[in-house]
From Swiss-Prot:
Region (ZP-N): 335-430
Region of interest (Beta hairpin), ranges: 149-172
UniProt lineage: Eukaryota, Metazoa, Chordata, Craniata, Vertebrata
Organism of origin: Mus musculus
Propeptide: 619-642
Domain spans labelled EGF-like: 28-64, 65-106, 107-148, 293-324
Lipid-bearing positions (GPI-anchor amidated alanine): 618
Glycan attachment residues as annotated in the record: 25, 38, 76, 79, 233, 276, 323, 397, 448, 514
GO cellular component annotations of the record: apical plasma membrane; basolateral plasma membrane; ciliary membrane; cilium; endoplasmic reticulum; extracellular space; membrane; plasma membrane
Cystine residue pairs: 32-41, 35-50, 52-63, 69-82, 77-91, 93-105, 111-125, 119-134, 136-147, 149-160, 154-171, 175-268, 196-283, 218-256, 224-288, 249-257, 298-307, 301-316, 318-348, 336-426, 367-390, 507-567, 528-583, 572-579
UniProt-recorded name of the protein: Uromodulin
Length: 642
């Protein structure tokens, strides 16, 4: 059974159509260089074919752009605009719309997206389809791109005033923009004259000797250098009232308010008044000031206080941002000084917690608080940096000494409510000074030295157990073996430490407590160590406020069991003297004269194993030492310096 003729004809027609279509978009070529720039070259054996790329139409040798936007079925832009491009197309939206992933356009809300609207700061942005509007607030004028205020449209305390070179009207605080009237003749005590304030218009502040605020009572005629003096018929406002309206009256012909005009008054945070004045209704009329009013009534206000006016009187009041609701929010200041510890609390914050009459004390109630001021008002309390006073407790480890105490707060001397307790402490790294203060009975020596003039310097000298110089020997005497080392430290306390340094000029040992004993063993002489004794090491001398040396323990030849140490010290002015010794090479040793008024003494030190009692030898020193320990925690030497 053969294929019907009708089907054969149909197949031939379709095949012919595809062949023609293919031939219309591609062409055989001899080489690829014959293909158009927007065509693709394919090589199949010996056949080279040029075919136009997608988005182009032609025979491959010549290809032209196909306009997909010309017919709706060749692009998929729905409610967006189709824009033809070489070989393709794109969908575009009008201004105010945004293209979605589905290639449709949606409205842009310029009012909700930052940076898209240009409305004035006071205007309200209103979104519309494809656009937006700017609307000025009620009482303001303008196109929304710029809004100007009008009288009565500003918030309380502000006024509609011109600003900038173009004089556009904006709401401003008149306390920051006013003119000054300084004429002394405005005083109600000034006599006759014929001044007239016809040219006044705007906000003004009165300053100078004539007074700083308007008179509040009727002023006699022919005063204030004018015929009919003008006065404020009413009281001045308080700071919380903002801008108030008052009547200014002019006294003439036995009528205290013969003429009147309305003015505005405001109490400003800086402790002064400003007045929105208008020209008087007649001439000669002028505004008068009260000479009893004074400037600077708020100069004592601190940074955490506002200057406010109550019934025409200025006073300082804590700012609202000082208010707290919990003790944990208290701002404190802890100062860990060399001799004292001070704890301070902000007074305004205490008042916001209800402490109007603060009663502050420490573990020892005899140590109570006091008021002090700098930029702020504080309630402070001080305790010596020592164990015991004010109930202060000392804790000590190998590296630090820590003093702690408890601060108690009450609202009065008698207590019915819960009192507040605040623990505080200061930690000090152990050095020679701190270690002496934290020792119960360090081996020290004391001597007062005066260098004519004024200025007191204290020098201490102590014997330590190790090269760290943080553990002083305790007690009135020390027993050591000849293998042990003596670590001696001297330190300058107080005075101008940036200028003066401590120099040990002569340090020596004697077998008796007499520093002038002819039997002397010099450890340091003429500021330099004894070179024959290799155990001597000067750690520091003439470089800072402290000086240190060490030497191995020894005994004197003969029937001597005790050793006493003596050091002559000197305060060297580093700004004008060479203080650090130069000890290299052979040096002449004088040591003939030692100023005993500059000598500190330590001892006795006895050799371990000696059974002889040293109590008698130390008794006189112990009695003297016990007296000094009540005054100083270490050996002291006082310098009086000009």
């Amino acid at each position: 059974m053969g294929i019907p003729l009708t089907w054969m004809l149909l197949v031939m027609m379709v095949t012919s159509w595809f062949t023609l279509a293919e031939a219309s978009n591609s062409t055989e070529a001899r080489r690829c260089s014959e293909c158009h720039n927007n065509a693709t070259c394919t090589v199949d054996g010996v056949v080279t074919t040029c075919s136009c790329q997608t988005g182009f139409t032609g025979d491959g040798l010549v290809c032209e752009d196909m306009d997909e936007c010309a017919t709706p079925w060749t692009h998929n832009c729905s409610n967006s605009s189709c824009v033809n491009t070489p070989g393709s197309f794109k969908c575009s939206c009008q201004d105010g719309f945004r293209l979605t992933p589905e290639l449709s356009c949606t409205d842009v809300d310029e009012c909700s997206e930052q940076g898209l609207s240009n409305c004035h700061a006071l205007a309200t942005c209103v979104n519309t389809e494809g656009d937006y509007l700017c609307v000025c607030p009620e009482g303001f004028t303008g196109d929304g791109w710029y809004c100007e205020c009008s009288p009565g449209s500003c918030e309380p305390g502000l006024d509609c005033l011109p600003q900038g070179p173009d004089g556009k009207l904006v709401c401003q605080d008149p306390c920051n923009t006013y003119e000054t009237l300084t004429e002394y003749w405005r005083s109600t005590e000034y006599g006759v004259g014929y001044s007239c304030d016809a040219g006044l218009h705007g906000w003004y502040r009165f300053t100078g000797q004539g007074g700083v605020r308007m008179a509040e009572t009727c002023v006699p005629v022919l005063r204030c250098n004018t015929a009919a003096p003008m006065w404020l018929n009413g009281s001045h406002p308080s700071s919380s009232e903002g801008i108030v309206s008052r009547t200014a009256c002019a006294h003439w012909s036995d009528q205290c308010c013969r003429w009147s005009t309305e003015i505005q008054v405001k109490a400003c945070p800086g402790g002064f008044y400003i007045y929105n004045l208008t020209a008087p209704p007649e001439c000669n009329l002028a505004y008068c000031t009260d000479p009893s009013s004074v400037e600077g009534t708020c100069e004592e206000c601190r940074v955490d206080e506002d200057c406010i006016s109550d019934n025409g009187r200025w006073r300082c009041q804590c700012k609202q941002d000082s208010n707290i609701t919990d003790v944990s929010q208290l701002e404190y200041r802890l100062e860990c000084g060399a001799n004292d510890i001070k704890m301070s609390l902000r007074k305004c914050q205490l008042q916001s917690l209800g402490f109007m009459n603060v009663f502050m004390y420490l573990n020892d109630r005899q140590c109570s608080g006091f008021s002090e001021s700098d930029e702020r008002d504080w309630m402070s309390i001080v305790t010596p940096a020592r164990n015991g006073p004010c109930g202060t407790v000392l804790r000590r480890n190998e590296t630090h000494a820590t003093y702690s105490n408890t601060l108690y707060l009450a609202n009065a001397i008698i207590i019915r409510d819960i009192i507040i307790r605040m623990n505080f402490e200061c930690s000090y790294p152990l050095d020679m000074k701190v270690s002496l203060k934290t020792s119960l009975q360090p081996m020290v020596s004391a001597l007062n030295i005066s260098l004519g003039g004024t200025g007191k310097f204290t020098v201490r000298m102590a014997l330590f157990q190790s090269p760290t110089y943080t553990q002083p020997h305790q007690g009135p005497s020390v027993m050591l073996s000849t293998e042990a080392f003596l670590y001696v430290g001297t330190m300058l306390d107080g005075g101008d430490l940036s200028r003066f340094v401590l120099l040990m000029t002569n340090c020596y040992a004697t077998p008796s407590s007499n520093s002038t004993d002819p039997v002397k063993y010099f450890i340091i002489q003429d500021s330099c160590p004894r070179t024959e004794d290799t155990t001597i090491q000067v750690t520091e001398n003439g470089e800072s406020s402290q000086a240190r040396f060490s030497v191995q323990m020894f005994r004197f030849a003969g029937n001597y069991d005790l050793v006493y140490l003596h050091c002559e010290v000197y305060l060297c002015d580093s700004t004008s003297e060479q203080c650090k010794p130069t000890c290299s090479g052979t040096r002449f040793r004088s040591g003939n004269f030692i100023d005993q008024t500059r000598v500190l003494n330590l001892g006795p030190i006895t050799r371990q194993g000696v059974q002889a009692s040293v109590s008698k030898a130390a008794s006189s020193n112990l009695r003297l030492l016990s007296i000094w320990l009540l005054l100083f925690p270490s050996a002291t030497l006082i310098f009086m310096v000009q």
